[in-house]
Amino acid sequence: MPAPQPLLPLLFAFVLIHLTSETNLLPEPGSHPGMCPNQLSPHLWVDAQSTCERECTRDQDCAASEKCCTNVCGLQSCVAARFPSGGPATPETAASCEDFQCPQQGSNCDIWDGQPVCRCRDRCEKEPSFTCASDGLTYYNRCYMDAEACLRGLHLHVVPCKHILSWPPSSPGPPETTARPTPGAAPMPPALYNSPSPQAVHVGGTASLHCDVSGRPPPAVTWEKQSHQRENLIMRPDQMYGNVVVTSIGQLVLYNAQLEDAGLYTCTARNAAGLLRADFPLSVLQRATTQDRDPGVLALAECQPDTQACVGPPTPHHVLWRFDPQRGSCMTFPALKCDGAARGFETYEACQQACVRGPGDVCALPPVQGPCQGWEPRWAYSPLLQQCHPFIYSGCEGNSNNFESRESCEDACPVPRTPPCRACRLKSKLALSLCRSDFAIVGRLTEVLEEPEAAGGIARVALDDVLKDDKMGLKFLGTKYLEVTLSGMDWACPCPNVTVGDGPLVIMGEVREGVAVLDANSYVRAASEKRVKKIVELLEKKACELLNRFQD
C-alpha cells in the first residue's frame, strides 16, 4: 500500500526535532549553572526579565549566580539564574559533593547536570540572633549575613554594633515655608509608608504584597513565609520561587494562588541604621461558598489549642487559621478533621476577630511613616531589638507604635529592665585619679562600639578641652576627635558607664602603646563646671608633683 510511506520521513523528522530540542537544553561549555526564568515558567517572563540593562552575549559576561537571558527588548541581559524545585534528575552515578569545597562564604555544594556546583544557601533559621556586619547592615542572624555575602560575591564578617545615643539631627525648615522639609542626612532605621493589611484571594487568583519602606540609606528587602519548620526560605528581589515572584522594588506577587499558599508572609527591611520585620497575612478562599459559622461558643472553642488526637492524615493542601499562643496572633495550621469537622478559620481576619481580645500590643506593630509630608521626629519600639529607636513620622496614617519621646516609648513598651546596676565605685577620688592618669579630657561621646566577646569596645569622643596629656600630643596635633579603647567591660553593667548621658564628660585614663585606654578603674564623670574648675586648679598648683614627693 503506497499511502503509509510518507509516515516514515515524518517520524524521522519528529525524532530529529525532539533530539535537537533535548540537545539545546544541555549546558554549553563555560555556561553558568541554572536556567533562564522563562525556561521554567513563561508566565513570569516580564517579571523576571523586564530590565534591558546590563547587556551580555554569554554567561561569562555575568556574575557566577546569573545567566545571560533574552529580555523583553529583544536583546540579552544578566538575570539571576533559576533552579527547578528539587533540581534536575541525575543518574545514580552522578558526582557527589564529597571533597568538593565551596570557597564563597554562604555557599553549599549541590549537584547540577551530574556535576557538583556551589549554590548560595536560600534557607535560614527562624531564631533571631542579630548580627552587625562589615557592610554596615544589621542581619536577623548570621545565616542571613552569609547568604547575602554569597549573593553579592563578597566576604562579610561580624563587627560590633553601634549605639544610637541621641536623636539624629534633622532640618525641618522654617514654619513659614511651604516646601517639603527634608530630614537630615543622618542614618534612619527602616519604616513602612503604610500599615500591613490582611488580604484574601480566591483559588487561582493573584495577590500582591508591597513592603513599601523608607530609610536612610535605602533599606534592602527580603521576604519569607512563616512555617512550622526549623528554617524559612529567604525570597529575594528579582527572583522566582514556584508561583511567587519578588520584584526589584521588593513587591511579592503570588500567581495562581492555591489553598496551601495561605499564611503569614514576613517582609524584612534592613539598612545600616536598623532592622524591620512586618507580617502580611494572606488568606486563600475556595470559590464554593461556605456556611457561616456561629460566632459564639464554636468560635471561642476553635481558638483553644487542639489537644484532641485525630485519626488519619491532614486534609491534602488545606490549611486553616488558628490562634498561636506563642505569637499572640493567628497563624496557619494544616487542617485536621476530628469528628468530621476541621477546626479553624478560613481567613486571618475571622481568626483575629474571634480569638484576639483587646486592641492588641501596640509595641509589636512595625513603625509606619505614612504618606504625608509633615515630617516630625518620633520614637518607635522594636520588638526584635527590644529597644526604642527614632524614626520620622509624616504626620498621618501611622499606628499606635508612635511616641513623642524616648522616655514615653520606654514607659509604654517592654524594654528589658534588669536589676539596676550599682553605681560605679571609683578606686580613687578626683585628685588621685588625675595624678595616676596619663590624660584627662572633656568631651562628648559620638559613638560606642561593643565587643562583648573580647569584653571590650571602642568609644569615639569629640574633644571639648584637653586638660592633661602626657603621651599623645593632642593639643600639639590639634586633635578634634579621640578614639578610646574600652578594656574589661561588662556590658550588662559597664564601668565606667560610657553609654549614658548626652552631655560633656570628664574622662581620665591610661595610654598604652600610644592608644588611649579606659578600664574599670578609670575616672568618667559628668563635666560640671565645678569639677572642671577643680581639675584646672590642681594642675596649676602642680598637686601631682607634690603627691609624688610624699609617696617617694
Swiss-Prot record:
Record keyword Repeat present: yes
Ig-like C2-type domain location: 190-283
UniProt domain Kazal-like: residue ranges: 112-163
GO BP terms, alphabetized: muscle cell development; negative regulation of transforming growth factor beta receptor signaling pathway; roof of mouth development; skeletal system development; transforming growth factor beta receptor signaling pathway
One protein family per Pfam: Kunitz_BPTI
Broad class of where this protein is predominantly found: secreted
Keyword flag Glycoprotein: yes
Site (Reactive bond): K126, E127
Domain NTR, chain residue ranges per copy: 413-544
Alphabetical keyword list: Disulfide bond, Glycoprotein, Immunoglobulin domain, Metalloenzyme inhibitor, Metalloprotease inhibitor, Protease inhibitor, Repeat, Secreted, Serine protease inhibitor, Signal
Region forming the signal peptide: 1-25
Compartments where located: Secreted
Tissue expression notes: Preferentially expressed in the developing inner ear and the dorsal neural tube.
S-S bonds: C36-C69, C52-C73, C56-C68, C62-C78, C120-C150, C124-C143, C132-C161, C211-C267, C303-C355, C310-C338, C330-C351, C363-C413, C372-C396, C388-C409, C421-C493, C424-C495, C435-C544
A single GO cellular-component term on record: extracellular space
Annotated WAP domain residues: 29-82
InterPro entries: Elafin-like_sf, Ig-like_dom, Ig-like_dom_sf, Ig-like_fold, Ig_sub, Ig_sub2, Kazal_dom, Kazal_dom_sf
PANTHER family: ACP24A4-RELATED, WAP, KAZAL, IMMUNOGLOBULIN, KUNITZ AND NTR DOMAIN-CONTAINING PROTEIN 1
Family: Belongs to the WFIKKN family.
Function text: Protease-inhibitor that contains multiple distinct protease inhibitor domains. Probably has serine protease- and metalloprotease-inhibitor activity.
Comment block on domains: The second BPTI/Kunitz inhibitor domain is able to inhibit trypsin. It has however no activity toward chymotrypsin, elastase, plasmin, pancreatic kallikrein, lung tryptase, plasma kallikrein, thrombin, urokinase or tissue plasminogen activator.
Protein name stated in the entry: WAP, Kazal, immunoglobulin, Kunitz and NTR domain-containing protein 1
Originating organism: Rattus norvegicus (Rat)
Lineage: Eukaryota, Metazoa, Chordata, Craniata, Vertebrata
Gene: Wfikkn1
